[in-house]
Amino acid sequence: IPVLAPQFIAQYAPAVNEQDVGIFVSQSGETKDVLNALERAQAAGMTCFSMANVIGSTLTKQTTAWLPLTCGYEISVPATKTFTNQVITFLNLANLLGGGDGRALEGLPDLMEETLAMCEPQVRVLAEEINAWNDFYCLGYGATLPMALEGALKLKEITYAHCEGMLS
């Protein structure tokens, strides 16, 4: 169940136990809300793993094991490198847990390059067209909802425009 750390504390922490597993995700490994959720989960006996970009962070030290993102120091607020690596790491983990051989993502770099090249002209046209707008809504449903939420956050952080991600 993907959940925001404060929501986990309020809604799910009272119900977890030693038969549950949690993966706690933080770019820095120092996000207070995530560390608070981790503390509650561990107090309930949950097995806790983490995914972080900073080796030796509080989060990585306090979990049973951690998945390193190794995408380098994040200098921009939107944390695009970290987010991209988090998605790829989760895809790889899901593939392996589902019985895959770990090679499912081998073609991903080429696919990403093709997608960027194919979309670049349309993205430039769209950016030019909506550049003066002040309000944006990114809508998603099901598996695309997290992308809509993250897309809205990226637009807010980079453009300072009003943008909301929401369920369609």
Where are the language model's segments positioned?
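Active-site phosphate/pyrophosphate-binding segments
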Residues: 65-168
